[in-house]
């Protein structure tokens, strides 16, 4: 999909760059593959804000996407490519030979009428899913499982992908787009290709109202607040904050590592995504 640039006929149109979605399905989603979605407004079960700057936005239906791809050796045909408001990637409606329908993440270069299959060893074509044990080294993949049978968790956002770079014992080595090199079990499933909509990051929404439609509220700088609200707040006139940048709770906010070093999966990371910054 290409990008659409608009002429500055109004202030909201100036600089506006959106994704051209003219080739996507224009109807409603399959009713049996959707369910209701209640907005939380960034609040948890106690009603307190745990994720700031969220609220409002257009109503959405949740599309049930098959991340597991565990219907083996049954070919499916791509019926249509659809927009999904709940993710940055597009989704594809597929129909299996036995009549069952499902939504999957649409990879790049997947077209209406294409055949896809999940198998222990399938052709290297966009949309086909298989475990790493049946995949040639060098394959570009997305929707990668971290635990066999759990469903894909890695490389699901628009334009993302990972590369299968090697095998070691019972593990497959994959290089993520962040630069991280990590291992997953060879029994884990992955789908061939890179995720659709790679131009998503090049959009410019042009006005605050469009972000409100998406459910994103304004971000207020700490230095614009009062001292009761933020460590950078207060002062006479405009100030610089007077200390290293911190969160509203006083923790360093720029570049501080927050990952728990005692995570069980830590030993599966061969090369950190931060390694290139260290010059390694």
UniProtKB/Swiss-Prot annotation:
Among InterPro entries, the record links this protein to:
NA-bd_OB-fold (IPR012340), Rib_uL2_dom2 (IPR014722), Ribosomal_uL2 (IPR002171), Ribosomal_uL2_bac/org-type (IPR005880), Ribosomal_uL2_C (IPR022669), Ribosomal_uL2_CS (IPR022671), Ribosomal_uL2_dom3 (IPR014726), Ribosomal_uL2_RNA-bd_dom (IPR022666)
Annotated Basic residues bias: 256-266
Keyword terms? Ribonucleoprotein, Ribosomal protein, RNA-binding, rRNA-binding
Q: Could you confirm whether the keyword Chaperone appears in this record?
A: no
One Pfam family, short name: Ribosomal_L2
GO cellular-component term (any): large ribosomal subunit
Q: What SMART domains does this protein's entry cite?
A: Ribosomal_L2, Ribosomal_L2_C
- Might you name a Gene Ontology BP term for this protein? cytoplasmic translation
Q: Which GO terms describe its molecular function?
A: rRNA binding; structural constituent of ribosome; transferase activity
Residues forming coiled coils: none
Report whether Glycoprotein shows up as a keyword of the record.
no
Disordered, as annotated region = 33-55, 224-266
The protein's assembly and partners: Part of the 50S ribosomal subunit. Forms a bridge to the 30S subunit in the 70S ribosome.
Output the PANTHER family linked to this UniProt entry. LARGE RIBOSOMAL SUBUNIT PROTEIN UL2M, RIBOSOMAL PROTEIN L2
Q: Which family does it belong to?
A: Belongs to the universal ribosomal protein uL2 family.
Q: What does this protein do?
A: One of the primary rRNA binding proteins. Required for association of the 30S and 50S subunits to form the 70S ribosome, for tRNA binding and peptide bond formation. It has been suggested to have peptidyltransferase activity; this is somewhat controversial. Makes several contacts with the 16S rRNA in the 70S ribosome.
Task: Report what the protein is called.
Answer: Large ribosomal subunit protein uL2
Species name: Ruegeria pomeroyi (strain ATCC 700808 / DSM 15171 / DSS-3) (Silicibacter pomeroyi)
Q: Name the gene that codes for it.
A: rplB
């Amino acid at each position: 999909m290409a990008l659409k640039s608009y002429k500055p006929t109004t202030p909201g149109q100036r600089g506006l760059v959106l994704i051209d979605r003219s080739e996507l399905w224009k109807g409603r989603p399959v009713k049996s593959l959707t369910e209701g979605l209640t907005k939380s407004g960034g609040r948890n079960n106690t009603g307190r804000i745990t994720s700031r700057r969220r609220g409002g936005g257009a109503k959405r239906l949740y599309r049930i996407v098959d991340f597991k791809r565990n219907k083996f050796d049954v070919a499916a045909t791509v019926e249509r490519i659809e927009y999904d408001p709940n993710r940055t990637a597009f989704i594809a409606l597929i129909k299996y030979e036995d009549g069952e329908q499902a939504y999957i993440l649409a990879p790049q270069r997947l077209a209406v009428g294409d055949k896809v299959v999940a198998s222990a060893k399938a052709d290297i074509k966009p949309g086909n899913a298989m475990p790493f044990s049946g995949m040639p080294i060098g394959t570009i993949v997305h929707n990668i499982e971290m635990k066999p049978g759990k469903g894909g968790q890695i490389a699901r956002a628009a334009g993302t992908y990972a590369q299968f770079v090697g095998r070691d014992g019972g593990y497959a080595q994959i290089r993520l787009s962040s630069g991280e090199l990590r291992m997953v079990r060879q029994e884990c499933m992955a789908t061939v290709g890179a995720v659709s909509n790679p131009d998503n990051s090049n959009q410019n929404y042009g006005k605050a109202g469009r972000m409100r439609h998406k459910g994103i509220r304004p971000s207020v700088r700490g230095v614009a607040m009062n001292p009761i609200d933020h460590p950078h707040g207060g002062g006479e006139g405009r100030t610089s904050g007077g200390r290293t940048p911190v969160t509203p709770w006083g923790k360093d906010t720029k570049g501080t590592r927050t990952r728990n070093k005692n995570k069980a999966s830590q030993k599966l990371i061969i090369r950190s995504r931060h390694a290139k910054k260290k010059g390694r």
